Amino acid sequence: MRHYEIIFLVHPDQSEQVGGMVERYTKLIEEDGGKIHRLEDWGRRQLAYAINNVHKAHYVLINVECSGKALSELEDNFRYNDAVIRNLVIRRDEAITGQSEMLKAEENRSERRERRERPEHGGHEGLDGDSDKADE
């Protein structure tokens, strides 16, 4: 069996169906003796260019080890599912199990956003209060 990295984009109006689609696709691979090494739901993202007048899509990344038969069946599912607007299958030399760069960047962004929104109580307030007392 070979290793593949699969990314597919789902129409934003069908985002609520992504969970069922992922479940169906992983079941297809596992029933054929394949293995899921990594599964990441990147959520809705802006497209670099419009596809059929759609400017956003729901991204899903799956790293699998599967047979050619399972892969061709998966590609057929992508082709005949109107909700999947694009897909990309890349053959890899080995299984990739770590977090993707895309997910790491998203986590870093959310951490920075949380730090920015969370008020700091580290001593900035004390300095302002002391200067007010000194003026009296």
UniProtKB/Swiss-Prot annotation:
Disulfide bond positions: none
Gene Ontology CC terms: cytosolic small ribosomal subunit
CDD domains found in the cross-reference section: bS6 (cd00473)
Protein name: Small ribosomal subunit protein bS6
Domain of life: Bacteria
One annotated GO biological process: translation
Region called Disordered, residue ranges: 99-136
Residue spans of biased composition, Basic and acidic residues class: 103-136
Keyword terms: Ribonucleoprotein, Ribosomal protein, RNA-binding, rRNA-binding
HAMAP family documented for this protein: Ribosomal_bS6 (MF_00360)
Keyword check for rRNA-binding: yes
Name of encoding gene: rpsF
Function description: Binds together with bS18 to 16S ribosomal RNA.
Annotated InterPro entries: Ribosomal_bS6, Ribosomal_bS6_CS, Ribosomal_bS6_sf, Ribosomal_S6_plastid/chlpt, Transl_elong_EF1B/ribsomal_bS6
